[in-house]
Amino acid sequence: MLFDQIASNKRKTWILLLVFFLLLALVGYAVGYLFIRSGLGGLVIALIIGFIYALSMIFQSTEIVMSMNGAREVDEQTAPDLYHVVEDMALVAQIPMPRVFIIDDPALNAFATGSNPQNAAVAATSGLLAIMNREELEAVMGHEVSHIRNYDIRISTIAVALASAITMLSGMAGRMMWWGGAGRRRSDDDRDGNGLEIIMLVVSLLAIVLAPLAATLVQLAISRQREFLADASSVELTRNPQGMINALDKLDNSKPMSRHVDDASSALYINDPKKGGGFQKLFYTHPPISERIERLKQM
């Protein structure tokens, strides 16, 4: 059951990434068709923009991410309990020892960052270290180390980059339509009025309008799948599903973080640091903790 869940989560992630690339290609084709008389040209431009966005975000410095979240680096002397747990989990996962940070915040939370295991880091809040016992801390750090081993940060970064590229292209197309660019393009087209042309025009407009929302939903779906995968992978490392269940139960009862956390960083944490409600739940980067616990109980 454990390995079935891991395989299923990986498969779903790759399907969602494929959907992402198709969305980007669709928007690029639509923009090219409407404004430069070449859908294929627009598609190529969109893929290049997405590639540049992804590269620029993947190589963002770990120091920048940690600084944005108010984290300070610790070592074996200053935080021996946390350091040794991370060391043990990294050893079991067969990855290099990540750098270790602490965030001074009473909320219970943790996250990992780094585009690959060679430049990765993990951070935990002081509140988490004060409340979690050894088994629960191992489960949480196993979750974060699993994100590193599974290259989740890189995958999530690619998803954010593609969503940003889609939103940028759609916004650019909207501004051009506002200033009459599409109207001039269509009026100059000697095939204007052809039935197929009208259908293509409508489809292109719908793609430009709806793609940003679709991209956001796909991005969130990828983030949720990687959380499920990290939970299951943590159990694979610790061989202790109850430790992960107990840790998630405590995380669920934790208050929101006291410091502001930007949207990009929110997706990194093991528990959504904002804890919004109502309509905001549709745009959570994390699956409900109750659902995560239920999946662990089925192992």
From Swiss-Prot:
It comes from Streptococcus pneumoniae (strain P1031). This is Protease HtpX homolog. The gene is htpX. The active site is at 144. Its cofactor is Zn(2+). Belongs to the peptidase M48B family. GO terms for cellular component: plasma membrane. It is an enzyme of class 3 (hydrolase). The keyword Membrane applies. Its EC number is 3.4.24.-. Binds 1 zinc ion per subunit.
